[in-house]
Amino acid sequence: MAGEAVSEHTPDSQEVTVTSVVCCLDSVVEIGHHVVYSVVTPLIVAVLIDTMAGEAVLEHTSDSQEEIVTTVVCSVVPLVCFVVSVVCFVISVVEIGHHVVYSVVAPLTVTVAVETIAEEMDSVHT
């Protein structure tokens, strides 16, 4: 699906290459740019998945968790993070059918998935 974010989130300081337009905090992110982020507080993960009945549900957890992504959407929970370097990058693997594993180390809200119009960015502000 065009516009899917495909970068992986890990609970450590990390530098990644942006491979698609993604949600971010107060920063312009373009494809091909390098983004440095760091997780420094307790972690809350929001995952949007489909139930057997086809209803979309938002799953919250404070423990390590693995889910299969069945719907690609932007998380509706507010983002709370502390910017340590260039930008706080809070995107996880969001290709449909992919397994996503979350290692919870500290609280931070993670935007799990986002679908954007080509060359456009969705911004989420605190």
UniProtKB/Swiss-Prot annotation:
Major place of localization?
membrane
Give the UniProt subcellular location, in the record's own words: Membrane
Specify the protein's topology with respect to the membrane.
Multi-pass membrane protein
A Gene Ontology term for the protein's cellular component: membrane
Cytoplasmic topological domain ranges are 1-28, 97
All ranges on the Extracellular side of the membrane: 50-75, 119-126
Coiled-coil portions = none
The organism encoding this protein is: Saccharomyces cerevisiae (strain ATCC 204508 / S288c) (Baker's yeast)
Q: Give the transmembrane ranges.
A: 29-49, 76-96, 98-118
Keyword tags: Membrane, Transmembrane, Transmembrane helix
Please report the name of this protein according to its UniProt entry: Uncharacterized membrane protein YAL064W-B
